[in-house]
Amino acid sequence: MTRRMLVCAVLLALPLAAYGEDKTIKRPPVATNPAFETMKKLAGTWVAADEGGKPTDQVMSIIKVTSGGSAVHETLFPGQPHEMVSIYTVDGPDLVMTHFCVLGNQPRLKADSQSPANQICFQFAGGSNLDPTKDKHMHSATLTIVDDSHIEVAGVGWDGGAPAKDMCCGLKLVRKQ
């Protein structure tokens, strides 16, 4: 049994080792748009702001650029029981987000290309593991870039095909220095 496992491990590791050593792999250019470039600039750790707008110790969001610059990965409420992930990518001309919710669904939202200059406004564009006419889910979100160190996030959740009053509270975040 141990020999079989060793053979399987070697067979699985060979392609990974070969890929890791080949520095000549040609990648196509990464699709982009202005809103996606804005999202990339938000990479870092974001903490809750106190009532005066000053940073606290409460980490609320960790944003990083990944996958060769083709995706932005956001972890919301890291380490908490309600931790969630949102992935931002470019699909054709559009910035899109898939939100992996603590509710077990994955709403997809598309950024409105006509959003104000300091905002990215996302609207529901489908999803997995949800029926938008019945199930509770995130339905829209607005990210406001106040300045390089301050952002605000407001969302609207839906339940039963209508806005829900108990979801997606607003957040005021400060970039951790």
Go through each PLM region and give its residues.
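Bacterial N-terminal signal peptides that target proteins for export
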Residues: 1-7
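General secretory precursor processing signal
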Residues: 7, 11, 171-172
